[in-house]
Amino acid sequence: MPTQEAKAHHVGEWASLRNTSPEIAEAIFEVAGYDEKMAEKIWEEGSDEVLVKAFAKTDKDSLFWGEQTIERKNV
């Protein structure tokens, strides 16, 4: 079983490859139960639950989900 540090590193790499904010990637993996196939599906389809969790992790006003910029005020 991977350590929390290993999971965080993997999520960070995953986020970087997809031009996605780390907060969004972390929230995707939490919702997916750290199942990479499920995480990929969520990333492709989008999720309001993920956005709520991601903005709860930061005080930033905007985050990136691939090519899209998500504004806090729209969540």
Curated annotation (Swiss-Prot):
InterPro entries: YccJ. One of its GO terms (cellular component) is cytosol. It comes from the Bacteria. Pfam families: YccJ (PF13993). This is Uncharacterized protein YccJ. The lineage of its organism: Bacteria, Pseudomonadati, Pseudomonadota, Gammaproteobacteria, Enterobacterales. The gene is yccJ.
